[in-house]
Amino acid sequence: MIRKPAVAGYFYPSNRNELLSLISSFHVQQSEVSCQPIGVVVPHAGIVYSGRTAMYSYNALRNSSIRDFIIIGPNHRPMTPYASIFPSGSWETPLGNAIINEELASELYKNSQYIVKDEESHSVEHSIEVQIPFLQYMFGNSFTFVPVILGDQEKVVANDIASALMRLSKPYILIASSDFTHYERSDIVERKDMDLISRIVDLDIDGFYDTIERENVTACGYGAIAILMIIAKKIGAKISLLNHSNSGDVTNDYDEVVGYSSIVACRQI
């Protein structure tokens, strides 16, 4: 099955050349990552707003030899409490078709109590779709991916999926798709996001969930972030913030913004 793009022309240009031009404009200066990336956190807003921040994470993956990606994001319209996997086929974007790794998808599905095969839930969800053009820009056709979107994002689900991922037979890089605090003043977004990011960097999983609830941090893909944190903690990886921004940096309206973060988890080689 080929999944057709749901948000081309809305979250990113539907024209191939315009899309390539926009992504290539997100030139960022950053140091080489001197360790082996196991995963990243990336935003999933319209890429004119969050693409520059997202590029920090994708640049961190540039020199990795691993070309199989598990992309986990939120289901913004959850019809089920379960996590939905798109098990086979490909996803179409203006840059071509990206191939699903059916072997890894099948393993992940079998390893988890909470993952169900559910292509329909992916049909209009954007949190994974907006990542595909970045991977195509970076790696052409030389990658595969597995898409999973979360309904319930609580710790029990995150722990189950993290455990399922750690039992996969092939190496992969985890892409956790999440925006951070939504639609508050930029100073409030900065405070809430940095409070949450400090928990992420410290691999404080309980503190992370406590902060989400106590501070009402509206990070829509928090379950995906938690999965990355759990895996990083279990294997002794470290997490670092690469970049943080908000939509006001593009619109110049700082009264009601959305926060974006680029974060990498890696272990020493």
Curated annotation (Swiss-Prot):
Q: Which domain of life is it from?
A: Archaea
Q: Which InterPro entries match?
A: MEMO1_fam
Question: Member of which family?
Answer: Belongs to the MEMO1 family.
PANTHER family, per database record: PROTEIN MEMO1 (PTHR11060:SF0)
Query: What name appears for this protein in its UniProt entry?
Result: MEMO1 family protein TV1383
Say which species the protein is native to: Thermoplasma volcanium (strain ATCC 51530 / DSM 4299 / JCM 9571 / NBRC 15438 / GSS1)
